[in-house]
């Protein structure tokens, strides 16, 4: 049976996008409650994402299960900026860069574990769960490429979209696969538009909604056997 191509559409509101993103940012800066910000954002995203075939997405993860790892990740991502304190202005950029590079293998390890947990907590109804099979070495390699591309200013969208295609290609479920169709050029153009609108301050909630819509709209779900999905629920243990 040929695979069924299913598009995704994000229908969340602009002010809700602003509120959830702001909550996520605040809780991440506070480090310890970072998991509650992430879970709240993911649950809201899943509840507001519609699939072309009428299926429903839900996020069933609990922040209390993974709060420590989310806190560790938030701390690791803030650490390079903290390292610049007390350093002379002409050396701050170098200190941040060195700290970022040194911490990258550990950041990759924590992120990959969290990504696997997040994918396992997403449910498709009718259907079930999935798992992320991406390897640590592969993900670390992509993270190095994306991090290095940030310093080129214009190449990071191409690196980021390539990494997202690689990650989505490693999502496995019962009769289901995921692909990401966004391009680097498309993301670069959208980013310039988002930045231009954000300068005006007022459109920021709509900019955030557009960001969620763009990334969600470039996800595709492929079902190889629709009838089997209606009968089988995949149990994923992390």
Predicted feature descriptions by range:
Residues 16-38, 64-111, 141-161, 189-212:
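Hydrophobic alpha-helical transmembrane segments in multi-pass membrane proteins
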Residues 1-22, 37-72, 112-142, 161-190, ...:
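Membrane-interface extramembranous regions at the lipid-water interface
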């Amino acid at each position: 049976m040929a695979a069924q191509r299913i598009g995704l559409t994000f229908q969340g509101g602009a002010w809700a996008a602003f509120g959830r993103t702001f909550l996520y940012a605040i809780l991440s800066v506070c480090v310890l409650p970072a998991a509650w910000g992430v879970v709240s954002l993911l649950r809201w995203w899943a509840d507001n994402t519609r699939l072309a075939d009428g299926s429903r997405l839900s996020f069933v993860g609990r922040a209390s299960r993974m709060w420590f790892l989310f806190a560790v990740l938030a701390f690791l991502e803030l650490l390079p900026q903290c390292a610049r304190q007390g350093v002379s202005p002409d050396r701050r950029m170098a200190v941040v860069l060195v700290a970022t590079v040194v911490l990258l293998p550990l950041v990759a390890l924590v992120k990959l574990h969290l990504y696997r947990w997040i994918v396992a907590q997403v449910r498709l109804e009718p259907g079930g769960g999935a798992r992320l099979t991406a390897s640590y070495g592969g993900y670390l390699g992509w993270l190095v490429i994306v991090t290095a591309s940030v310093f080129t200013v214009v190449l990071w969208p191409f690196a980021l979209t390539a990494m997202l295609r690689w990650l989505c290609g490693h999502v496995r479920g019962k009769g289901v696969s995921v692909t990401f169709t966004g391009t680097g050029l498309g993301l670069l153009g959208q980013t310039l538009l988002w930045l231009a609108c954000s300068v005006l301050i007022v459109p920021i909630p709509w900019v955030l909604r557009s960001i969620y819509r763009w990334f969600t709209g470039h996800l595709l779900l492929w079902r190889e056997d629709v009838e089997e999905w209606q009968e089988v629920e995949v149990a994923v243990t992390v």
